[in-house]
Amino acid sequence: MGVRASGTTCLPFIRILFLAVLIGAAPVAALAAPRAVATSTATAIASQAAGVASVPTEAVGRPSPTRISSGDTAWMLTSTALVLMMTIPGLALYYGGMVRKKNVLDTLAQSFIVTCLVTVLWYAIGYSLAFTHGNAFIGGFSRVLLHGMGKYTVTTLSGAVPESVYMTFQMTFAIITPALIAGSFAERMKFSALLWFMSLWLIFVYSPVAHWVWSTDGWLARLGALDFAGGTVVHLNAGVAGLVTALVLGKRRGYGRDAMPPHNLVLTVIGAALLWVGWFGFNAGSALSAGGRAGMAMVTTQVATSAAALAWMFVEWAARGKPSVLGMVSGAVAGLVAITPASGFVDPTGALLIGIAGGLVCFWTATYMKNFFGYDDSLDSFGVHAVGGGLGAILTGVFAVKAIGGTAGALEGNIGQIGKQLIDVGAVLVYDVVMTYGILKIIDAVIGLRVSEEEEVEGLDLSQHGEQVYE
């Protein structure tokens, strides 16, 4: 595996990426414009009595809502802020507390810079590839550089909120997904390689998968697979990519021999708490309206998270003699992950069972299975997110309630729904493995993925950033 000085690769990265996006995307948008859907952005007419604005319809091949709800829009703006908080500072602190003290700044920087990088890429091309009309596998170019998106533009996907709000809400999902991957390769990837990997992975993995599952054109959406808030699109996707990255990079120096305890569990607990609160925007916000379904998603999220934290705590207590704080917060995150695809489809009892299953299964995969196979999934991104997301997606097909989400699960006689969920999980897993591996090998051949042994021993805070938190 080639190792090169990471500092020499940042300038070419910036030149190539941003010149290509900001200069090259404009002609693409111009070429796509004749085929782009017509968009009207005329001024809204206020409806004072109902608090709703009447707006022109965006013609995207089928009728769109013609009214913007101020209440729904306010809820979606709030949810967007909550989900962004999940990454910065939530995930940054959660991961930052679990690494060794010589790598904490690099870990925090990963979440922070991924937020910045994905924001620009989502604006430039990612949103268009994920959520515009194209084919069953990928969207088109009609929203490159957000071309044609106006102040009052609405779409069939955005419902009764402006498309700009829907786009930004989806941006926060696109931000946290690659940020989650970093939990598997913490403490050993070059920062320059991280920038390249996150950029290519967003465009070639996340955007297509989001289109499959959440776009009205997507083949998994048309199949009838259920994923309310990202069990496969976000968590399975990120966790599988994390495992592939961990295997390609190899283990940390001294893994299995040297002690590598979390340097500050207080940061991790604070981060987990921020993730928990932000997850209400993640799940309940995915209803895209401030109504009964959002309320039920909030209830199921709270119940499943609490059940999973308790399940993890008790099984760890029985297995190891003491309940650890890290185990409690890991169980809570496992429950949040497991309920994500099901939160808008199941009732509280189904959520309780999904939470318990998520806590127990993720405890096993993050401890015994990882130790048995010997891979270095540093912060258990695979063990919690891939396993929890996949498990939750499958159990959605079991516990879905037609009166809540419009689709019955196996317990209501729709046994075939489990098959659709399995296809969803399998398709995302296979595509993710192949594409992630290819992206990593290309980057490794060009600039190298991993820091040198000396840099790893010194710590990534100093070797990659020239700074340190602790003297």
Predicted regions and their residues:
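Bacterial N-terminal signal peptides
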Residues: 14-26
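N-terminal signal peptide c-region/cleavage motif recognized by signal peptidases
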Residues: 25-27, 33-34
